[in-house]
Amino acid sequence: LPARQTLYEYYHDKFGFGAKTGIELGEASGYIYPPDSAEGNEVRYSAMTYGQSMNLTMVQVAAGFSSLVNGGQYYKPTVLVGTIDESGNLKSSENKVIRQTVSGGTSSQMRTMLTTARRSSFLSKSDKSGYEIGGKTGTSEAVVNGAYTQKETIATYIGYGGGKNGAEYVIMVRVAAPGKGINLQGNLHAGPIFTDISNWMIDYMKIA
């Protein structure tokens, strides 16, 4: 139970998995079974360590991942750039730090691991040179009629990019073909989409 409790505290309490983020859009809370519940058994928690047996939204995952690469600070997700007053002046919204998820040292180590994974992939050949790009693929079994199936998979890729100031954006891509019986792969189907958006973001944000 202590090990499951620690994992639950990281996933739910620190990274916000299984809870609404408060973003200004309609959202689901998802769920993570508490370790002291009947469903929160050792088998389920073992599966949770590699991403199964829990229900998360992409906003939750992207927000939690952002804290892993920005020094450990969890920012409240928002779609608001700011507000415009009667004179037409834009007042930028303030970034709100909610909590610390990991230490700065852990965040730095995660970035090293993510950039290493990126550089070892064929995907990095299409990255703009001179920038820090890191990420990780995901290929998961789809759920059909309440059970995992090996006949259909979902492809994901989540990563970040930045320049001399460190991580400046996070992108998560999910590719699925429900009911088509297609085995999608993170590196082949989601990764290239991330690359295209990442290269565009560098130009759009004028990252140095």
Where are these regions (language model features)?
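Beta-lactam-recognizing serine transpeptidase/beta-lactamase-like catalytic domain environment
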Residues: 1-175, 190
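A generic secondary-structure boundary signal that marks alpha-helix termini
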Residues: 70-74, 119, 180, 199-207
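Glycine-rich loops and low-complexity Gly/Arg-rich segments
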Residues: 74-75, 158-160, 182-184, 195-199
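Short, gly/Ser/Thr-rich active-site loops of penicillin-recognizing serine hydrolases
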Residues: 89-97, 188-208
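A short acidic/glycine-rich loop-to-helix N-cap element
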Residues: 177-189
